[in-house]
């Protein structure tokens, strides 16, 4: 039977996801057979698993850090918010329904928790170490009785716990004390120490706080991780991207149900992006409509709030328009939807020659494709699809050459006048394509072509893991785990 280590946080955004990612790589580098686990995640950023299911991007990244193929077992329950206090429930990678928060808490949660714990038990049997990520804070008084992602998991797994806090926000010592005081004695006993994340400054200034924590709780500070710029996606971190107007003004519309905005991280690093919330702001060189958890409702929101007219006017004035997944569907001529919104046929924005019909079966696949858009024609790209819709266009953006490694020949996406749309999430992580796309626009604007910096998720994981390893007591953690 393997061991379990759980990372809890004093709040959302404390650094749990990335600390788990780093620990996964650290223990993998030490030769341990390690896997990640999060019983329940609420996120609009998802990715395909090896089984053809859907998991959170955080556990997808952690699987890569473990050198494992991403599996639905690493994130059995995924909640995808739909608005109006409702979420789509995905269990073991497949949608099983849409419920209100109250109904979920009262009806489905316990059943799914039992099933998720069975998955966790199986992971412990098969691997040396399972590193578990908690969710939000483990001691929210109004939610504790319904919480199936934190201390109940830790106690079930007989895991050792690490409590991480974001010191960059301020109040980290108070947050740790408050969390520890609200934990039950048996929960507090599982905590082996504390980690302070995103610290800037002289670490010695924190010593009085460390001494206080050790004296009060008998538990050490295991590490202080310096604040560092990195390119690893932080879960649901849209707010982390400031408005940046580079030499090209790239605007992304912040839809009410925006999903998979990790698609645009390469654009952020290569040029800068501007997330737009008002239609009068739409005057960029590029306007992007991102993916959406509820395509038709977001299309109607664009229409009712003046964005549709602003997009058409900006396009007429020379803006290049791009749609990714749901954004592509919105830019087409029409959508027939009896699945997500059940509104039937809805007129699209009409900038792309495409028609979309929603189907009940969700496609969740890794794709290899060849681009047909003229400035990058013939270029090989890869990405993934997570969608209900099937679109038809006489001018496809690309041809899918392989689905999950199996050869195929399937047109996808659409090309319009100064516009394209694609189902390929991760298209801009193909750096050769992104460089070609940006330079096409730069030359149009009278700017010199540039070479954009290449980087890989693998390199970023290794770099961040090394930083964490240098700043936490790995030997002590190993000792506590009995490894």
Swiss-Prot record:
Transmembrane segments: none annotated. Residues 247-433 form the GATase cobBQ-type domain. Pathway: Cofactor biosynthesis; adenosylcobalamin biosynthesis. It comes from the Archaea. Keywords: Cobalamin biosynthesis, Glutamine amidotransferase. One of its GO terms (biological process) is cobalamin biosynthetic process. One of its GO terms (molecular function) is ABC-type vitamin B12 transporter activity. The active site is at 325 (nucleophile), 425. HAMAP family: CobQ. Belongs to the CobB/CobQ family. CobQ subfamily. Catalyzes amidations at positions B, D, E, and G on adenosylcobyrinic A,C-diamide. NH(2) groups are provided by glutamine, and one molecule of ATP is hydrogenolyzed for each amidation. NCBIfam families: cobQ, PRK00784.1. This is Probable cobyric acid synthase. It comes from Thermococcus gammatolerans (strain DSM 15229 / JCM 11827 / EJ3).
């Amino acid at each position: 039977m393997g061991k379990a280590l759980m990372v809890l946080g004093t709040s959302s955004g404390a650094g749990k996801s990335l600390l788990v990612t780093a620990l996964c790589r650290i223990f993998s580098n030490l030769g341990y057979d390690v896997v990640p686990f999060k019983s329940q995640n609420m996120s609009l950023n998802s990715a395909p698993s090896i089984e053809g299911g859907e998991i959170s991007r955080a556990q997808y990244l952690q699987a890569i850090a473990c050198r494992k193929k991403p599996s639905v077992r690493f994130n059995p329950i995924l909640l995808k918010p739909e608005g109006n206090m409702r979420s789509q429930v995905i269990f073991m990678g497949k949608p099983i329904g849409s419920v209100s928060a109250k109904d979920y808490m009262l009806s489905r949660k316990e059943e799914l928790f039992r099933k998720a714990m069975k998955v966790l038990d199986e992971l412990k049997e098969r691997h040396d170490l399972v590193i578990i990520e908690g969710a939000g804070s483990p001691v929210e008084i109004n939610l504790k009785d319904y919480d199936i992602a934190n201390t109940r998991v830790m106690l079930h797994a007989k895991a050792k716990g690490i409590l991480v806090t974001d010191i960059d926000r301020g109040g980290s010592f108070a947050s740790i004390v408050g969390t520890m005081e609200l934990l039950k004695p048996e929960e507090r006993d599982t905590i082996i120490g504390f980690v302070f994340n995103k610290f800037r400054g002289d670490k010695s200034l924190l010593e009085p706080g460390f001494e206080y924590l050790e004296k009060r709780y008998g538990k050490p500070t295991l590490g202080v991780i310096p604040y560092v710029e990195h390119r690893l996606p932080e879960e649901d971190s849209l707010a982390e991207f400031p408005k940046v107007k580079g030499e090209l003004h790239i605007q992304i519309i912040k839809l009410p149900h925006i999903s998979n905005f990790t698609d645009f991280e390469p654009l952020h690093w290569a040029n800068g992006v501007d997330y737009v919330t008002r239609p009068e702001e739409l005057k960029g060189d590029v306007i992007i409509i991102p993916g959406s958890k509820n395509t038709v409702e977001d299309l109607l929101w664009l229409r009712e709030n003046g964005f549709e007219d602003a997009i058409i006017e900006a396009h007429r004035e020379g803006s290049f328009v791009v749609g990714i997944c749901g954004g592509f569907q919105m830019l087409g001529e029409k959508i027939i939807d009896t699945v997500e919104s059940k509104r039937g046929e809805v007129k699209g924005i009409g900038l792309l020659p495409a028609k979309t019909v929603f189907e009940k079966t969700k496609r969740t696949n890794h794709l290899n494709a060849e681009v047909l858009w003229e400035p990058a024609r013939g270029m090989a790209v890869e990405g993934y699809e997570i969608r209900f819709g099937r679109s038809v266009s006489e001018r496809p953006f690309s041809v899918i050459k392989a689905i999950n490694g199996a050869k195929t020949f399937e047109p996808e996406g659409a090309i319009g006048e100064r516009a394209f749309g694609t189902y390929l999430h991760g298209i801009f992580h193909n750096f050769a394509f992104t460089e070609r796309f940006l330079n096409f626009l730069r030359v149009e604007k009278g700017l010199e072509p540039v070479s954009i910096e290449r980087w890989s998720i693998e390199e970023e994981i290794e770099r961040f893991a090394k930083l964490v390893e240098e700043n936490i007591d790995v030997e002590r953690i190993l000792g506590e785990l009995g490894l």
